[in-house]
Curated annotation (Swiss-Prot):
Its main location: cytoplasm. HAMAP family: 23SrRNA_methyltr_M. GO terms for cellular component: cytoplasm. It comes from Salmonella agona (strain SL483). One of its GO terms (biological process) is rRNA processing. This is Ribosomal RNA large subunit methyltransferase M.
Length: 366
């Protein structure tokens, strides 16, 4: 199998294509990207027959910025007969996947695909039963086995393939299903909530998002991001010249500091989290984030970079490279991840975790 489907935000296909071409090429997995504007997906076609499987095995999915999900696929199945769509799909998957742990019948995240999604939901149940009978799926769902993907691009027209459970998005279509809390001050709260789901493993939440932690929210007004921190019982310094929602102030967990987020300097040395969603040039925000991390003013940070109209992948890459260079220069070992989230628009969200040990990823550093 030599094709990899990457789901992305509609309108960002070129960025997704540029990124996968760049990162696959650095691993000597060469190919070309098929791009259709506003389609919500990209197909990276490798030159070598087995390189699709090699790509999803060797390149960490967490290193991708513009892809929400990816999976390796075979040739496009077309003109599926309405009276029996299941048999051709089962036939394509037999011998490709054995004992998959989950089935996802998906579409791209576009308005045109909404009607098709209704069909996918109904189609999933009988298809799952047939795939279990054929040995393509296990008799029960398990997160330890490959995920089987059936991706419809039009009625009667789909790609079939799989992703690896340890190197994909755990979410259907790569989108966490979040509900807007009625008491939140703004919809931006969903950006931070999604970021926490995407960047922090669920089994580490109790330790890394613990009750009683101290946090700073730069550019906090009216408090959408502060709300998420308060909800996790943190003490929050909300920095903004604009007013905070009274409902947050009434919790007693928020200290409102009427200052410019770029000029504020923390007066305590036990801040676990700093978050930032300020509307400013990405280079200026990145420089500020580097300053916080180099000086050890926080342990972890989540921040947004607003994107220009052109060369968006290049802009993000340049800023992340600058941040990494600053950390390296000052001997700071850190983990950096970036993703264009479902709730992001013309922006990407970055998570950086400062590690105190020389070797990242140790259990006692989590």
């Amino acid at each position: 199998m030599n094709k990899v489907v990457l789901l992305c935000r509609p309108g960002f296909e070129k960025e997704c294509a540029a990124e996968i071409t760049d990162k696959a090429g650095k691993r000597e997995i060469f190919g070309f990207a098929r791009v259709k504007e506003n389609a919500g997906y990209v197909i990276y076609e490798c030159y070598q027959p087995e390189d699709g499987e090699k790509l999803i095995s060797e390149l960490p999915f967490s290193s991708l910025i513009f892809a929400r999900q990816w999976f390796v696929v075979g040739e496009l199945l077309q003109h599926l007969p309405p009276e029996d769509r299941i048999t051709p799909i089962v036939g394509m998957l037999q011998g490709v996947v054995e004992k998959g742990g989950e089935l996802r019948v998906e579409v791209a995240d576009t308005n045109e695909s909404k009607e098709l999604m209704k069909f996918c939901r109904k189609f999933t149940v009988p298809l799952r039963a047939a795939l279990r009978d054929a040995g393509v799926l296990t008799n029960y769902e398990t997160p330890k086995r490959p995920v089987v993907h059936v991706f419809f691009i039009a009625p009667g027209c789909c790609y079939t393939g799989y992703s690896l459970a340890h190197n994909n998005s755990p979410f259907y279509m790569g989108i966490p299903r979040l509900k807007f809390p009625s008491d939140a001050p703004s919809r931006s709260t969903l950006k931070l909530e999604e970021a926490l789901h995407v960047f922090i493993p669920e089994d580490e939440w109790d330790e890394r998002l613990a009750n009683g932690m101290y946090a700073v929210d730069l550019g906090a007004c009216p408090g959408g991001w502060t709300y998420q921190l308060v909800k996790r019982n943190m003490w929050v310094y909300s920095v903004d010249n604009g007013p905070m929602a009274q409902s947050l102030m009434d919790t007693g967990q928020v200290t409102w500091l009427r200052e410019d987020g770029f000029r504020y300097r923390p007066n305590r040395n036990n801040i676990s989290w700093m978050v930032c969603d300020m509307v400013e040039k990405p280079a200026k925000v990145t420089a500020l984030m580097a300053q916080w991390l180099v000086n050890g003013w926080c342990r972890e940070t989540i921040f947004n970079l607003k994107l220009p109209m052109k060369k968006r992948y290049e802009e993000v890459s340049h800023n992340l490279a600058y941040l990494q260079a600053q950390l390296d220069e000052h001997g700071v070992n850190a983990q950096i991840q970036a993703r264009q989230l479902y709730h992001d628009r013309e922006e990407v969200t970055v998570h950086v975790r400062r590690l105190w040990a020389a070797v990242g990823g140790r259990r006692d550093e989590r």
